[in-house]
A protein has these predicted regions:
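Ferredoxin-type iron-sulfur electron-transfer modules and their immediate structural context
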Residues: 2-103
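Iron-sulfur-cluster electron-transfer modules
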Residues: 59, 76, 86-263, 267-272
């Protein structure tokens, strides 16, 4: 049995070499009939490994309605989609070793429209955590995780450079890490990595300082004692590193007396 360019590997067909119907010769391609297409070789090994994870249970609830595909930002520009992840697992793909594992942005769009409440915001971090434990991490992510572990930020910058954006900046900013006897502040501002190290982030940080000062807010920053919030590290499966960062930052929050904690970005908000 040969397959033409239009045939699919899962499709089967019947064809008579000689066939005459009501006097009409329909031999060969003219009488080809396709059987119902179905996938018979299911391998649920890797599906079971995902659903057995703490947080991965809902992966098995998908019933392929494809609601998620239309709202997935990654599927709009590529071939990834929650429904496709389910189908690939169903037919024997090892997600722990596949590049698709790292494509999900955990934006929660799919959960918003899913009638079965398949929660990719829990599934993907859980699967990534297992991949991290197995050593299956893309090189660029490994570099980022190493930087955070060693330097406290994904850029690999020295902790002393966290306040470099304050040079030649005339607005008053209270750096609590530099004070021998720091006094309580009303607002403790967690500046974040990109506000501290990135050029455009520096501009945003300075704008925030101007807003605080114009409003007469009594605020302070952690300076060199601040570290990455760890939210992105948690989402890529490095739960252990996230817990270390949370413990460190939590200790700084307790060290400096304050009434309110203000953060610069949603990652820090989610993390804390």
């Amino acid at each position: 049995e040969k397959l033409s360019m239009a045939d699919h590997k899962y499709e089967k067909w019947i064809q008579k070499d000689e066939a005459i119907i009501d006097g009409i010769d329909v031999s060969g391609e003219w009488n080809k009939m396709y059987e119902p297409r179905e996938i018979m070789n299911y391998d649920l090994t890797y599906m079971d490994e995902i659903t057995d994870l703490d947080g991965g249970e809902s992966m098995g609830w998908c019933y392929q309605c494809a609601q998620c595909i239309g709202v997935c930002p990654v599927d709009n520009v590529g071939s990834y989609g929650p429904r496709k992840i389910y189908r690939n697992l169903q037919t024997g793909q090892n997600l722990f070793e596949h590049p698709d594992l790292w494509l999900c942005t955990t934006c929660s769009n799919c959960l918003r429209v899913c009638p079965k409440e398949v929660d990719m915001m829990k599934i993907m971090p859980a699967a990534r955590e297992q991949a991290v434990l197995d050593g299956n991490v893309p090189a660029e992510l490994q570099d980022m995780l190493q930087n955070v572990a060693e330097y406290g930020n994904p850029m690999g910058e020295s902790a002393r450079k966290r306040v470099r954006w304050l040079r030649k900046f005339e607005e008053p900013v209270q750096d609590l890490s530099k004070e021998d006897d720091p006094q309580p502040v009303d607002v403790l501002w967690y500046v974040s990595d990109y506000f501290s190290f990135h050029g455009r982030g520096n501009d945003a940080a300075k704008s925030m300082v101007r807003v605080f000062n114009r409003l007469g807010v009594d605020f302070g920053i952690l300076g060199k004692e601040e570290k990455c919030d760890g939210d992105s590290q948690r989402l890529v499966g490095e739960t252990g590193l996230f817990e270390e960062l949370a413990e460190h930052n939590g200790a700084q929050f307790e060290k400096y007396e304050h009434n309110k904690l203000v953060v610069s970005d949603p990652h820090a908000y989610n993390a804390f």
